[in-house]
Every structure is written in C-alpha cells, then in structure tokens.
Amino acid sequence: MSDINEIEIPSRKDEIRQVTPKDPMHEIEDKSTYHAKIKKSDSGTVLGAIPLNSRSSSNSSVTSTGQSSRRVTKKTTKKKKKNACYFDTCSSAASKFIGDCNFCKGHFCSKHRLMENHACNGLTSCKEQLHQRNADKLEAEQTKAPKIQI
C-alpha cells in the first residue's frame, strides 16, 4: 500500500467492522432509559439503568467516561432563608422563642405565630385535643358524693 487514501477491504463479511465509535448519547435520544455497564473493582460487572430526559438538555450536564455514561440534572429549587417566616406572603424574620409551631413544624414571626393566623394544618387536631383535655379536667373536679336532700 503505497497510497495513503487506499483502504484494504476485507474479503469476508465477518471481518468487516465499524471503525468510527458511536456516541452513546446520540443513539439513545428517543429512549427513556440508558443501560450503562459499570465495572466495580474485582467484583464483576454491574448493569445499571440511568433515566434520561431529552427535553431538559439545557439544564443538565453530560459526562461520559470509559464504560459508563451519566447524566446529571441540576435542580433549581427556591430555598427560604433559615430565619424567615414560613407564612407565604410574609418576609419578616421568624421569632426564635415563640415562633415555633408544634403541629406543622414551621417557624413564624410574631404576627403569624398563632395557629389561626398561619392557617395551621394541625388546627383541627389541636382543638380536639384541647376539648378532650378540658372534659377530663372537669370530670376530675366534679364532686363524687351524693347530694344531701333536705
């Protein structure tokens, strides 16, 4: 072979191989999962499924190494400040000592610290507990001796 552009063509079909490597991400654009072989140290090969979302390509980064391909999706969630009031429209700071709600586990400012003011989910169960406690207290205070008739 003296010319660089000449390529030797094998005579049998079994010897024909594809020379150019395929991009695994390009092949699976329309599939919902991609099975990647991940080799662990001396323990064998593990087959794992990695879900892909072809629509979220603008918010994700793709890294591929050797035998495994991974797709990492960044989640953009809105985090509240640690000491801000948990009420939706309030932006004031939560009270440190009196702002904790035991029923919904929220931290509220002095305006929204009461269960009625922040529309607590545990308001009905709290009312039932207080009603039962008052009934038990009244029953314990009642006199048990029969009344004397004159």
From Swiss-Prot:
User: Tell me, which GO biological process terms does this entry list?
Assistant: cellular response to arsenic-containing substance; cellular response to misfolded protein
ZnF AN1-type: positions: 79-128
Show the segment(s) annotated as Disordered. Answer: 1-82
Q: What are the alphabetically sorted keywords of the record? A: Acetylation, Metal-binding, Nucleus, Phosphoprotein, Stress response, Zinc, Zinc-finger
Q: Where is the composition biased (Low complexity)?
A: 53-70
Q: Does the keyword NADP apply?
A: no
Pfam families, from UniProt? zf-AN1
What are the subcellular locations of this protein?
Nucleus
The record's InterPro entries line, in alphabetical order, gives: AN1-like_Znf, Znf_AN1
Which residues, renumbered to this chain, carry the PTM N-acetylserine?
S2
- Domain of life, source organism: Eukaryota
- Give the principal location in a single coarse category: nucleus
Checking Gene3D superfamilies in the record gives: AN1-like Zinc finger
Task: Output compositional bias ranges, type Basic and acidic residues.
Answer: 23-33
- Residues bearing Phosphoserine are S43, S54
Keyword Zinc among record annotations: yes
Listed Basic residues bias regions: 71-82
> From the Swiss-Prot or TrEMBL record, what is one GO molecular function term?
zinc ion binding
Report residues binding Zn(2+) 2. C101, C104, H118, C120
* Sites where the protein binds Zn(2+) 1: C85, C90, C109, H112
In the UniProt record, which is one GO cellular component term? Answer: cytoplasm
Additional comments on file? Present with 9520 molecules/cell in log phase SD medium.
Annotated function: May have a role in protecting cells from metalloid-induced proteotoxicity.
Q: Report what the protein is called.
A: AN1-type zinc finger protein TMC1
